[in-house]
């Protein structure tokens, strides 16, 4: 008999104490091997159910995504009318292809709206490859630094094993984007475009870099264990490793054509077909034309595992040594939604991080948690957002851009959002998606706004210096966008 709600806490306490006293005995009692006779019984039970028979007939003959797609729901949610949109069209549709650069695309797509407006352009892209090159170089060096700082931990520790698992993946966070732009600036894509076997298809390149970095990790850990390995020896080793990583990178990518403070010349034709010439440095281009002030953007998340109104920091996550840490302010969904609307009303697009491609129909470009009729086959999804995060069912995997929303006239809250993706024009409807409010609440985790767009009580969390952040480990789902 199960305990009543009144005695439930006492029951759990007693249960845990039994586990601690005799874990092997208790676990043995709770073990349950598969009973073949029960399989036959279960099969008879399910096969006698007409609903189960219909479901299995359909799923054995058709693709599950196609068969369970609720087309009535799809048609209802595929509404492309938005009463709050940014004034500048973001063209052309970008395509990250077979790379994990979504964060760089979402961030540069946001800033290119400023360039399009400032220079009266019809089409424009910032060079994602320029930032990608330096991100790889910086991440490799950041990894080596993490190996040195964790040298006191056992090689089999969770931290060291996590660091070794993927030293220099393509992913990243908005604060990591800011770290790159502050150091290297921005340039037009016309000056430094993608390459087919490195930037747009990075798997092999990543594999070779990873192998070399793991070798370097062993070298550093071995040297640090030797008493004779003073600081100068480690620094010399690090410089040799940096040189070799740069050499490997130069095999796969051209070196960026200009240094951050070096002047480049860019010619372009505006909407009126007038020819212009710009002379600028990458750092100047970022501030003057892309209108980026790196001190103003802040990240907010909705993570119901932790108290709202608290700062959250992802430990050890970064790319540029000495750069800003990954820090968010945790708020409720209503606050996130209102900030998105406010920013769009100020004619600014919103960088956001979500769990993609959960409940996303790539053919039509609709993101809605009720698109697929899973209950029709007896498959229900009762877990709440906090539980999904805890049990690794939800995590931040993809960054995109919100460029519009439709606000209800009565509640003043958004009903749906216009989303710009970076998977090319054949994904969604010409590269654009519509996201429902319910999807936003369940599978959107992060947005980026300017600190002056926050209410004073929220802005002060970032500026007061009195807030101690909740520190989450580098492998936490809230850091997964950087994978």
UniProtKB/Swiss-Prot annotation:
Q: How is its activity regulated?
A: Inhibited by E64, a specific inhibitor of cysteine proteases, N-ethylmaleimide, iodacetamide, and mercury and zinc ions.
The transit peptide region is found at 1-30
| Pfam families in the record | Peptidase_C1_2
Q: Which InterPro entries match?
A: Papain-like_cys_pep_sf (IPR038765), Pept_cys_AS (IPR000169), Pept_his_AS (IPR025660), Peptidase_C1B (IPR004134)
What are the GO cellular component annotations? mitochondrion
- Coiled-coil annotation reads none
Residue positions of the active site: 102, 398, 421
Write out the annotated subcellular location. Answer: Mitochondrion; Cytoplasm
Q: Which residues form the propeptide?
A: 483
PROSITE patterns from the xrefs?
THIOL_PROTEASE_CYS (PS00139), THIOL_PROTEASE_HIS (PS00639)
What does the record give as the reaction this protein catalyses? Answer: Inactivates bleomycin B2 (a cytotoxic glycometallopeptide) by hydrolysis of a carboxyamide bond of beta-aminoalanine, but also shows general aminopeptidase activity. The specificity varies somewhat with source, but amino acid arylamides of Met, Leu and Ala are preferred
Post-translational modification remark: The N-terminus of isoform Cytoplasmic is blocked.
Biological process terms from the Gene Ontology for this record are: homocysteine catabolic process; proteolysis; response to toxic substance
EC number in record? 3.4.22.40
Its primary localisation, in coarse terms, equals: mitochondrion
Q: Which Gene Ontology molecular-function terms are recorded?
A: cysteine-type aminopeptidase activity; cysteine-type endopeptidase activity; DNA binding
The UniProt entry's sequence similarity note says: Belongs to the peptidase C1 family.
Q: What does this protein do?
A: The normal physiological role of the enzyme is unknown, but it is not essential for the viability of yeast cells. Has aminopeptidase activity, shortening substrate peptides sequentially by 1 amino acid. Has bleomycin hydrolase activity, which can protect the cell from the toxic effects of bleomycin. Has homocysteine-thiolactonase activity, protecting the cell against homocysteine toxicity. Acts as a repressor in the GAL4 regulatory system, but this does not require either the peptidase or nucleic acid-binding activities.
Protein name (Swiss-Prot/TrEMBL): Cysteine proteinase 1, mitochondrial
Q: Which organism is it from?
A: Saccharomyces cerevisiae (strain YJM789) (Baker's yeast)
Q: What is the lineage of its organism?
A: Eukaryota, Fungi, Dikarya, Ascomycota, Saccharomycotina
């Amino acid at each position: 008999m199960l305990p009543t709600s009144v005695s439930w806490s006492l029951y759990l306490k007693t249960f845990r104490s039994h586990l601690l006293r005799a874990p092997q005995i208790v676990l043995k009692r709770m073990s349950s091997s598969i009973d073949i006779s029960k399989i036959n019984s279960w099969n008879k039970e399910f096969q006698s159910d007409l609903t189960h028979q219909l479901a299995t007939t359909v799923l054995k003959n058709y693709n599950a995504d196609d068969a369970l797609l609720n087309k009535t729901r799809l048609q209802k949610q595929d509404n492309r009318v938005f009463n709050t949109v940014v004034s500048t069209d973001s063209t052309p549709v970008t395509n990250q292809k077979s790379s994990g650069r979504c964060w760089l695309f979402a961030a540069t797509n946001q800033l290119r709206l400023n360039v399009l407006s400032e220079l009266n352009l019809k089409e424009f892209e910032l060079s994602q490859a320029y930032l990608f090159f330096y991100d790889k170089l910086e991440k490799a060096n950041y990894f080596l630094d993490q190996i040195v700082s964790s040298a006191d931990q056992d090689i089999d520790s969770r931290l060291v094993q996590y660091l070794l698992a993927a030293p220099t993946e393509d992913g990243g966070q908005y604060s990591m984007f800011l770290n790159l732009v502050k150091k290297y600036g921005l340039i037009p894509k016309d000056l430094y475009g993608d390459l087919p076997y490195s930037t747009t298809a990075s798997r092999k390149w990543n594999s070779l870099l990873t192998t070399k970095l793991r070798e370097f990790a062993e070298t550093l850990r071995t040297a640090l264990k030797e008493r004779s390995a003073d600081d100068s020896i480690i620094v010399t080793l690090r410089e040799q490793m940096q040189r070799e990583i740069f050499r490997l990178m130069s095999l796969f990518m051209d070196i960026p054509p200009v240094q951050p403070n070096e002047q480049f010349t860019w010619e372009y034709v505006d909407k009126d077909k007038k020819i212009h010439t710009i002379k600028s440095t990458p750092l100047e281009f970022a501030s003057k034309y892309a209108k980026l002030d790196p001190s103003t953007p802040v990240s907010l998340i909705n993570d119901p595992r932790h108290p709202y109104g608290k700062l959250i920091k992802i430990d050890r996550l970064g790319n540029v040594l000495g750069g800003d840490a990954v820090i968010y302010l945790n708020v409720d969904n209503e606050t996130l939604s209102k900030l998105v609307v406010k920013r769009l009303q100020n004619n600014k697009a919103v960088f956001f991080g979500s769990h993609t491609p959960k409940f996303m129909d790539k053919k039509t470009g609709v993101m809605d948690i009720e698109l697929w009729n899973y209950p029709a086959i007896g498959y229900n999804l009762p877990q709440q957002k906090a539980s999904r995060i805890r049990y690794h069912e939800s995590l931040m995997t993809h960054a995109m851009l919100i460029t519009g929303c439709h606000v209800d006239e009565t509640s003043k809250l958004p009903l749906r959002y216009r989303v710009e993706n970076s998977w090319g024009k054949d994904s969604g409807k010409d590269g654009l998606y519509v996201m429902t409010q319910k999807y936003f609440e369940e599978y959107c985790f992060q947005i980026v706004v300017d600190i002056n767009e926050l209410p004073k009580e929220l802005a002060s969390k970032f500026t007061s210096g009195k807030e101690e952040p909740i520190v989450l480990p580098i492998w936490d789902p809230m850091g997964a966008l950087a994978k």
